[in-house]
Design a protein with these regions (language model features):
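A composition-biased, non-transmembrane "mature-region" signal
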Residues: 1-216
Length: 216
């Protein structure tokens, strides 16, 4: 199951690193320094946009990627899932991200990203319950146990912008929905990014200074 690509600048030399979605132990190809990526909460990613000069509004989507195993009378079956859902109460926005996470490169979200971020009201528990509900079950087929294995849950932000009372997709620049031209419809759901942190932990041995090795 394909994940998405992430662009990140090396905290040591500033060189561009191209990462996989699940990479946590990363090595810079320029300076060779290795770091372990850590976030206190969910990892947050933003999609790049094609609307320079516009005031971007980032809409949150909660995404699950993993395998759903079901234990039935006939045996154990599994289903690979890549599932995203809109995290705000604005139901006129796209309901899911579709294949965009796999098709577009992303960056980690943080205080350095210009624009306004909306709060995510959907919880991880809500998303996992929906993933379970979406798993097909044959009529009169009893499921004794269901497990989600290797799951990765993260937040992905879709960039939008408003112009003349219309909200546009900032990737395709196509209109999505009309919004009031006066007033701020997003003021009550704006999120604070002051606590968003992507932490780089050095992988050098604290005693001898040698590089520690590990899986990505």
């Amino acid at each position: 199951m394909a994940g998405f690509k992430v662009e990140q600048d090396c905290p040591q030399c500033g060189g561009r690193m191209n990462l996989e979605e699940t990479d946590r132990l990363v090595a810079c190809t320029y300076c060779g320094v290795k770091n372990f990526l850590y976030s206190p909460g969910l990892f947050r990613f933003v999609m790049g946009h094609n609307a320079p000069g516009k005031e971007i509004v980032y809409v949150p989507y909660l995404r699950f990627k993993g395998t759903v195993f079901s234990c039935r009378i006939q045996g154990v079956s599994h289903r690979i899932v890549d599932f995203s859902r809109l995290g705000t109460p604005f139901r006129n926005f796209p309901f899911s991200l579709g294949l965009r996470p796999q098709a577009l490169k992303m960056r980690f979200a943080g205080p350095d990203i210009q624009g306004r971020f909306l709060k995510c009201f959907l919880t991880s528990s809500d998303l996992l319950e929906e993933v379970t509900r979406q798993t097909p079950v044959e009529r009169d087929d009893s499921v004794f146990h269901r497990a989600l294995i290797g799951e990765a849950i993260n937040l992905i932000y879709l960039p939008l912008y408003g112009e003349k009372g219309i909200l546009f997709d900032a990737i395709t620049n196509k209109p999505i929905v009309r919004i009031p031209e006066k007033g701020d419809v997003f003021s009550t759901v704006a999120d604070s990014r002051s606590v968003w942190r992507l932490i780089f932990l050095s992988t050098l041995c604290p005693k001898c200074g040698w590089n520690l090795e590990g899986e990505r």
